[in-house]
């Protein structure tokens, strides 16, 4: 069982995140002025380092605050879908067979799934529903698929980086996918993505089965 995030640890994490955020703010201000190519290249390097610092804090927070308990993954997915529908989203759910109980933090897992659905809604056309599929094999698999423009193969590794927005018009924060992956990693699971240009994108959460 992973320990709950307490006030002391939270204070440390807040302190840790201030440095990279301050660096990003300073770089943004500097970029408003006239800078040459070499200076801008150095700024890009510093932004990358600062974002990696934020990523480490996000992962630390996600893992440190996880509380495991036996849950029904099908009910959790249905609850998340119901919440999305209430908010006006078009979501289609398919559950294949019976899903076994797993050990997970229901709050954090809902957060991860909510982030994936929100991402799919942003990038998919308004008239096309987001498709969610849940099934069990060697793990419990939960997939979220949109009918958006897709992601180029060369960009797939970047989408889990903090602050990355492949669509410059997106209103997202750039934190949803990194946080979702950190939460799933904290469950000893995996979050993977497959995509085809002009065909859409699928994110798949794989969660380990309970030990017998």
Predicted regions and their residues:
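Conserved DHp (HisKA) dimerization/phosphotransfer helix of two-component histidine kinases, i.e.
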Residues: 41-70, 75-87
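Conserved micro-motifs of the catalytic ATP-binding
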Residues: 63-69, 97, 101-104
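Short beta-strand/loop element within the Bergerat-fold HATPase_c
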Residues: 127-138
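Short conserved segment of the HATPase_c
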Residues: 151-163
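Short helix-loop "hinge" at the ATP-lid/N-box region of the Bergerat-fold HATPase_c
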Residues: 119-121
């Amino acid at each position: 069982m992973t320990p709950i995030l307490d006030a002391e640890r939270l204070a440390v994490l807040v302190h840790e995140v201030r440095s990279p955020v301050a660096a990003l703010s300073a770089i943004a201000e500097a970029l408003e002025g006239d800078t040459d190519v070499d200076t801008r290249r150095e700024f890009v390097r510093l932004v990358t380092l600062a974002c990696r610092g934020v990523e480490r804090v996000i992962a630390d927070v996600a893992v440190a605050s996880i509380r495991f308990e036996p849950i029904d993954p099908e009910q959790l997915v249905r609850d998340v879908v119901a919440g999305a529908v209430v908010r006006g989203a078009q979501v289609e759910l398919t559950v294949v067979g019976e899903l076994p109980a797993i050990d997970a933090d229901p709050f954090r897992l809902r957060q991860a799934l909510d982030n994936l659905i929100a991402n799919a809604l942003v990038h998919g056309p308004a008239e096309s529903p987001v498709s969610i599929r849940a099934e069990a094999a060697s793990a419990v698999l939960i997939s979220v698929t949109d009918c958006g423009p897709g992601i180029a193969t060369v960009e797939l590794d970047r989408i889990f980086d903090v602050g990355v927005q492949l669509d410059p018009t997106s209103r997202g924060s750039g934190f949803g996918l990194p946080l979702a992956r950190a939460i799933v990693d904290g469950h000893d699971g995996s979050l993977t993505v497959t995509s085809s240009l002009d065909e859409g994108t699928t994110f798949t959460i794989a969660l380990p089965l309970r030990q017998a």
